[in-house]
Amino acid sequence: MLNIVLLEPEIPANTGNIGRTCVATGSRLHLIEPLGFKINEKQLRRAGMDYWKDLDVSVYDNFADFLEKNPECQEKLYMATTKAKHVYTDVAFEEDAYIMFGKESAGIPEEILVEHEEFCVRIPMLENIRSLNLSNSVAIVLYEALRQQNFKQMQLLGELHRLHWKE
């Protein structure tokens, strides 16, 4: 199972969207405090729709608490940042990888990044853009990890509700 880690997320709608994406992909969500909202906030629930109840989510007091409670993540904790030297598509994500994203206003602190330099990845963008939306960034990197695993256990074919596809 892939793991999405949000370090101090600030915007409830982003976290709600990410929660919904985690449910849709069978991924676990890890939230590291302080959060910029309350878990029961209406905007968070609205963005996550009725999927929030199915979300596998854990909340941690801080980054050290997260590391202590997830010791297995040490060699597979990837950090998405605009400051990285490596592109996310150059990484071979493990089936149980942890992919961390920082808060919307500042990203992951540089003190953490330099300690995990070889695990830092970026999404390419034009140089005059500071960053992408957090929930979009999570979806981009998460779906690359899933693609590398051939979308294991995911429904690959869709079905029409009223009509049928031409064969």
Segments the model singles out, each with a brief description of its role:
Residues 1-167:
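Post-transcriptional modification and biogenesis factors for structured RNAs
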